[in-house]
Amino acid sequence: MRSLVCTLDIQSPVHFIGAGGIGMSALARILLSRGHRVSGSDRRLSPAMESLKTAGMVAFESQAAANFQALDRLDRSSPIVVISSAIPDHNPELVAARERQLEVWHRSDLLAALIDQQPSIAIAGSHGKTTTSTVVTTLLHGAGEDPTAVIGGIVPCYDSNGHAGQGRLLVAEADESDGSLVKFRASLGVITNLELDHTDHYRDLDDLIATLQRFGDGCKRLLANQDDPILSEHFQADAWWSVQRSDNVDFAGLPVALEGDRTIADLYEQGTFVGQITLPMPGLHNLSNTIGALAACRMEGVPLEHLISHLSELKTPGRRFDYRGDWQGRQIVDDYAHHPSEVAATLNMANLMVSSGRSPLPRSPQRLVAVFQPHRYSRTQEFQTEFARALLSAELVLLAPIFAAGEAEMPGVNSEALASVMQELSTQQSVLVASTMDELVSLVKEHSLPDDLVLAMGAGDVNSLWSRLSQSSSEGQASCPPALAA
């Protein structure tokens, strides 16, 4: 491995507004590791903020104009201010920064600058980009490449979403939600799939396709998923991968066995069989993500044998079928699924564990209970029927209130309406609706059974279900999770 340590030509301090966010904290961590003077604020000192504070960041527990006065006293005046799309124009700290005429960067500007510093793999797509980015990072790490990584989830091999590596490559997750990924000029762009989402930003599917085409055009080379009909029709890629065919694609992994705790597949390069692989994670979607990741590493010149030998070490990133623990015989799992296709794929994987009797969990579950928190009113309105169909595969569905993510309420758009559509589609469907998170916890307690898999899905605060259950347990029966392969 050739060492290549890259530093940005930034002499000023850097201040992150909303530093605790998953994308912002990764960037802050990398700048800290590379010796930059970093400060950051958020509404509370979350675990991410505490971790950054331990790493040397000056941390503020509020987003207030007074933070800049405090930085003046610390001789950190006139910082470059970094924001994400989640920070509104009326944010008091951002207003103060502009009144001071400070330089304000969007987080994508900073990530684009990092990408420009060294050969980079930027991974985009509607679904699977965090998992694919994590697998690329894990395989490169195992192969001795020590990549820099900027990921939208916790990468198990680093226990972090940001890692300042010494190797030649940078791996970045390219978020399409606000269109800012068109700024990236990566050595290799990867697109996992494409489906309409983020209707608060995109007019329609054509608008989303055009944005991803601009991303692809900005990359020196493009790798894409041949199995995705939108990609195969609308994109010109330098290389393609598939889990459905081995002919006329550059990389393929054809499933031999899809089991509840693992996936076995035949691996092909340029149509030639090169060996059989076993992944310690279930699901056809995870196989596709892994084949895409293997293809990206191969296109960057990493020997195949160095990659295959580390497949057994793969783990999904945090909040991707993340086993949290056992509560009175119920196995609690957290997943970030918040689009109908993601919900369907996650439930299919969970149902396979129930039906096959094989599972990466401590015990094979006997029944699936889906706990779903819709994310954003706009997404729930756009995909209400699709969400309802996807959720029907669970024996029991518990719905949390919609997580607004800053959006205003929309008349008639709520979890009760989603439940009504589910019952219109299937009169036999068992679905219950909670009006608060506390009521959701009560529903789980009352209606779940020992040996159930309780699968909490959503991009909001439904991931607090495990902690709420364990804190409310008066019998002290909650137990910490053991290490899992997936």
UniProtKB/Swiss-Prot annotation:
<dbReference type="InterPro" id="IPR013221">
    <property type="entry name" value="Mur_ligase_cen"/>
</dbReference>
<dbReference type="InterPro" id="IPR050061">
    <property type="entry name" value="MurCDEF_pg_biosynth"/>
</dbReference>
<dbReference type="GO" id="GO:0051301">
    <property type="term" value="P:cell division"/>
</dbReference>
<dbReference type="GO" id="GO:0009252">
    <property type="term" value="P:peptidoglycan biosynthetic process"/>
</dbReference>
<keyword id="KW-0131">Cell cycle</keyword>
<dbReference type="GO" id="GO:0005524">
    <property type="term" value="F:ATP binding"/>
</dbReference>
<keyword id="KW-0436">Ligase</keyword>
<comment type="pathway">
    <text>Cell wall biogenesis; peptidoglycan biosynthesis.</text>
</comment>
<keyword id="KW-0132">Cell division</keyword>
<dbReference type="Pfam" id="PF02875">
    <property type="entry name" value="Mur_ligase_C"/>
</dbReference>
<comment type="similarity">
    <text>Belongs to the MurCDEF family.</text>
</comment>
<dbReference type="Pfam" id="PF01225">
    <property type="entry name" value="Mur_ligase"/>
</dbReference>
<keyword id="KW-0961">Cell wall biogenesis/degradation</keyword>
<comment type="function">
    <text>Cell wall formation.</text>
</comment>
<dbReference type="GO" id="GO:0008763">
    <property type="term" value="F:UDP-N-acetylmuramate-L-alanine ligase activity"/>
</dbReference>
<dbReference type="GO" id="GO:0071555">
    <property type="term" value="P:cell wall organization"/>
</dbReference>
<keyword id="KW-0547">Nucleotide-binding</keyword>
<keyword id="KW-0573">Peptidoglycan synthesis</keyword>
<dbReference type="InterPro" id="IPR004101">
    <property type="entry name" value="Mur_ligase_C"/>
</dbReference>
<dbReference type="GO" id="GO:0008360">
    <property type="term" value="P:regulation of cell shape"/>
</dbReference>
<dbReference type="InterPro" id="IPR036565">
    <property type="entry name" value="Mur-like_cat_sf"/>
</dbReference>
<keyword id="KW-0963">Cytoplasm</keyword>
<dbReference type="Pfam" id="PF08245">
    <property type="entry name" value="Mur_ligase_M"/>
</dbReference>
<protein>
    <recommendedName>
        <fullName>UDP-N-acetylmuramate--L-alanine ligase</fullName>
        <ecNumber>6.3.2.8</ecNumber>
    </recommendedName>
</protein>
<feature type="binding site">
    <location>
        <begin position="125"/>
        <end position="131"/>
    </location>
    <ligand>
        <name>ATP</name>
    </ligand>
</feature>
<keyword id="KW-0133">Cell shape</keyword>
<dbReference type="InterPro" id="IPR000713">
    <property type="entry name" value="Mur_ligase_N"/>
</dbReference>
<dbReference type="InterPro" id="IPR005758">
    <property type="entry name" value="UDP-N-AcMur_Ala_ligase_MurC"/>
</dbReference>
<dbReference type="GO" id="GO:0005737">
    <property type="term" value="C:cytoplasm"/>
</dbReference>
<dbReference type="InterPro" id="IPR036615">
    <property type="entry name" value="Mur_ligase_C_dom_sf"/>
</dbReference>
<keyword id="KW-0067">ATP-binding</keyword>
